[in-house]
Every structure is written in structure tokens, then in C-alpha cells.
Amino acid sequence: MHDTTALSRPTAKDYTPADNPRFTKLHRRFPTVVDLRKHAPRHAPRFAFEYLDGGAGSDGGIARNWNALDAIELVPRYGVTTVLPSVGIDVFGKHYAAPLGVAPMGGPSIVWPGADRYLAAACQRINVPYALGLVGGMTVEDAAKVAPDVLWFQLYRCWRDEHAIGFDLVRRAQAVGVHVLVLTVDVPVRTTRTREVKAGITSPFRPDLRMIASILASPGYLSALWKHGQPRLGNLQPYTKDSADANEVAAFVRREMGGAFTWDEIARYRERWQRPLVIKGILHPADAEKCVALGADLAFAGKAFLWGLAALGAEGPGHVLDIMIDEMRSAFGQIGAQQPADARSVLVRHPGALQF
């Protein structure tokens, strides 16, 4: 009898880690993202690791998130697939190699100089979404040259002068072919991140002897800094005076940005943006349930890619994507999911779920 449940092999456009000749060698040393995290403080300066690894306050939120995710149990299902499944998906009319992408991040070049370029290049090579953050270190114009097929762009609320800067950024993104605009609604104020403050990441930024010594003790970081220069908020530089240094641009950002988008403001951005629009920051359980019911198609990660950068430099983002895609294919095979959409029907046990 013909087995209609068997899955055909991945199509030519579906990337797998086997396509990367460096994967096997890197995988021996760093088989998981956790291994990259352990190695990161040995390879990058201390202040860079504290900046990327910490959270708000005492890191209690990070611990709760880890515990909640670790408590999820996926019940295996066998006799469904005969090969490792393809994890390719179609989102907003585009095909991607996996249902994951690089989240928009602020200041990744503090973690590793040139970070935005390395992140964008890895996403373009592997074919997964790359969301450039407004306060990243690369302009949307430059990002479009590095990652023309996978570029998304994230905005915070630039409210002054009737959103003049925000609307101009939308114009710039549209002009260079950004595929998806992301509006962040879950950062109405900036919280205190204790570990980065103690490590010297403050505004205005004044590096001390301890930070300089840490850079000198990290030759890979020093080489990247020499090549790419100090971090800059490239997307916002055009709206400041030509002679503005990094601290002056940071002060400008604090004046221009703030608060969360209102729904009326989102509607105004929607009128100006003719392509897919994503609202980032859904936190309420009822809202999350609605998203799942409507069919959430992909997830974004941030810290994992920063751990990869801190541990491996330029090779880090690509190796993190390889790890995730490799693990995802194995997990889908174990739970009998022949494609990402099938994962929604898998039996899930979650005894550690937060109750509201």
C-alpha cells in the first residue's frame, strides 16, 4: 500500500546545516547554543558579555522564561516520517529555510564590532528573516545591500514633530525594498539593566581603564573594532548634526523616542507602509492565544545570536542558525511533524506554565 504519510526530501531551496562545510568542525566544539554562551566570556570583553547576557533588575525575568520554556514537553509520535523533515516555510509570500529569524536588537556591535553585518550576511546566506533594529549599527540602506532577500526593519516610536523621523524612516525602508516593517509596542520606557550598568555601559559612554584592558585582552574583538570602528546608531545619524559623536546621537535618541505606539499611530504607519506589517510585543495571554489561533508562523531569537557572536565572532550567527535548524529538524522528526504547520497539532504537556 502506498504510504501517503511519508515526506519527500527537502526541495532545492531548503537549506540544511550539511550545506555548510564548517558545521561539523564547529559542532564538535559547540553542539548547542548553551556551549556558545559558556565560551562567550572567554572570547569577548567582560563588558560585552554583561551587556548581552543580562536582563532587567536581578535577571529574574530571564530565569522565569528559561524555566517556563524548559517545562514544555512535546509528546513523540512515531511511524509518520521516514526522513528528517524540511522546516522551510512560506510567510508573507516569501519562502524561508526555517520558521525562525534574527530579532531586532539594540547595540549588537557592542557585543562584537560589525555584528549587524555578520547577522545580515548569515541570514541572507541561509535564507531566514533578518530584522534590523532601529538602534542597530547599520543603516537600512547598507542592510539592504547585504541582505536584500530577507530584510525586515524595526521601528520604535519616534513621536516628536508628528512622527517626522518615524515616517521618514518608513520612506527610506520602502525605497530600499525592505520586505516587512516591525513596530515595537512593548518598550514604553527603558528599564535598568543592572549588569550592564556595573560593567560600564552607560550613557554618556565613558570607557574606563578596566574596559580598555578587557578589549586589549580580547584580540579577536580588538581586530574587529579596528576593522569596523566603534558602534554607531547609523539609522539616526542623518537626523543629527554632521559632527555629532556617539554620545550626542544617543542623547538625541532619548529625546526623540519614547512611549508605546497607540493604535491610532499604528494606523498612520499602516497608511504609509504598503507591505506586510508586524506588531512586536504581544504579551497578554489572551492576545497570544489569538495569535496562535490565527496561525503564528515563525519565531525570532536575539540573545542566542549574540552569544554566537561573542563566542565565534563573524562565524557565530551562521553557526547558531545551523544549530537551531539541525535541532528543529530532529525535534520535528521525533514528534511526527512533516512540516512546521504540523507542530500546532502536537500534544504538548506544560506543567510549569504560568497561570494568570
List the predicted regions and their residue ranges.
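C-terminal helical cap(s) of enzyme catalytic domains, especially alpha/beta-barrels
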Residues: 65, 309-328
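Alpha/beta enzyme core
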Residues: 107, 120-121, 145-146, 160-307
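N-terminal pre-core extensions flanking Radical SAM catalytic domains
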Residues: 324-341
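Glycine-rich active-site/cofactor-binding loop and its immediate structural neighborhood
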Residues: 96-135
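Glycine-centered helix-coil hinge/cap
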Residues: 45, 162, 312-313
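An N-cap/entry alpha-helix motif that binds or orients negatively charged groups
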Residues: 2-93, 201-261, 343, 348-356
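A gly/proline- and charged-residue-enriched helix-loop-helix capping module
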Residues: 124-166
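Hydrophobic faces of well-ordered beta-strands that scaffold small-molecule active sites
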Residues: 100-103, 130-132, 151-155, 181, ...
